[in-house]
Amino acid sequence: MSRSSLVDPSFELSDPCPDIHALFIQFDARFFGGSLACCEVKWSPRMYACAGICSYEIRGGRGGLCSIRLSKPLLTLRPRSDLVETLLHEMIHAYLFVKERNRDRDGHGPQFQAHMHRINQAGGTNITIYHSFHDEVRLYKQHWWRCSGPCRDRRPFFGYVKRSCNRAPGPNDRWWSQHQQSCGGNFLKVKEPEGYGQGKGSKRTNDKNKSGGPALKKTITPPRVTLDDFFKKDGKNSSDNSTSKSPTKPSTSLFTGSGQKLGGSSSTSSLLNSYPKATQNSGGNRLGGTSGGVSRLLPPVNFTSPSSAPVAEQVIDLGDSDDDDFQDMDDDALEISFVASDNSVICPSCNTEVMENLIHGHLDYCLG
């Protein structure tokens, strides 16, 4: 085999663990004209049933993401040539997906075989239709179940179900309904990896006990802190210092005048006579008011009393609007009505007749 071959035995020593991304870029430029730049390639650490898989996802009807995944558990046990041929096998599927929209992953028809023979002749490889890693696949299937029904005596499986993960046979399997009709037996687990049922927590505890370390954590209670700890001075509490000293009275008086006796008749009369008396009108007492009922502090305001005749309804006609916001309304004029009340009361301050609905505002204005 020539050195130009992609699977030359010398590469097993010079490059036993190649970078799959570098190989992908090299093979894409050499055999596929760089048309697989939109694809991705990556390792799959939990794929045990097959060596490689190519998936295609359509997004929005304009193409999608093409992904190539290689089984790391299976290919790490195989020679470098198997990795190269498996990668090229999946790249042919990706090329048919991208260029011809052939989404049948298991399709190895004339188109697939044409590209397979072309690459085998150009690169000196031995790409095949199916992978033959049966020994490696069998190695990772450590969880076994066997049926208790009649199918345990039938070829070719004799009732065995072998898997790499701990997932018992059930309704999620495609063949489950057929098995229930033809056999109807129950699956019992007969084999699993050694030490699979042991928990990780007990293992860590045993390791600590063997090494002499503490097996259990001790709870340490922090010391209690009270407010008295923050008021200690020189080893003595502030309460002791405060009790040792007696309170002292002020030596001098704050007020030295003679003062006057509260409630005396002479002082009361003199204080009352020093202020002018407020005038009163016929309508009652009023602070700062005059006999005419007009405040001396505010400008005069005329309040007209309503007539004895009933007040007619006042209508404000806004008319038709030219604005576009009113185009969808009725053709009639938009009207807002205000009805006045004929109830009136007498202001207790200025004896003025004011409408009942305005009395509160009038009192604020009159007494202000």
UniProtKB/Swiss-Prot annotation:
Keyword match DNA damage: yes
EC number from the UniProt entry: 3.4.24.-
Ligand binding (Zn(2+) 1): H89, H93, H108
GO biological process assignments: DNA damage response; DNA repair; proteolysis
Zinc finger (UBZ4-type): 344-368
Compartments, record wording: Nucleus; Chromosome
Presence of the UniProt keyword Protease in the record: yes
SprT-like domain mapped to chain residues: 21-190
Result of knocking out the encoding gene: In normal conditions, no obvious developmental or behavioral defects are observed, except that but the brood size is smaller. Upon exposure of L1 larvae to hydroxyurea, replication stress sensitivity is observed, resulting in increased sterility.
GO MF terms held by the record: metalloendopeptidase activity; polyubiquitin modification-dependent protein binding; single-stranded DNA binding; zinc ion binding
Residues where Zn(2+) 2 binds: C347, C350, H362, C366
Major location (coarse): nucleus
Catalytic EC class: hydrolase
Keywords attached to this entry: Chromosome, DNA damage, DNA repair, Hydrolase, Metal-binding, Metalloprotease, Nucleus, Protease, Zinc, Zinc-finger
Low complexity compositional bias, start-end: 238-274
Similarity field: Belongs to the Spartan family.
Task performed by this protein: DNA-dependent metalloendopeptidase that mediates the proteolytic cleavage of covalent DNA-protein cross-links (DPCs) during DNA synthesis, thereby playing a key role in maintaining genomic integrity. DPCs are highly toxic DNA lesions that interfere with essential chromatin transactions, such as replication and transcription, and which are induced by reactive agents, such as UV light or formaldehyde. Associates with the DNA replication machinery and specifically removes DPCs during DNA synthesis.
Subunit structure: Interacts with vcp/p97 (cdc-48.1 or cdc-48.2).
Protein name: DNA-dependent metalloprotease dvc-1
Origin species: Caenorhabditis elegans
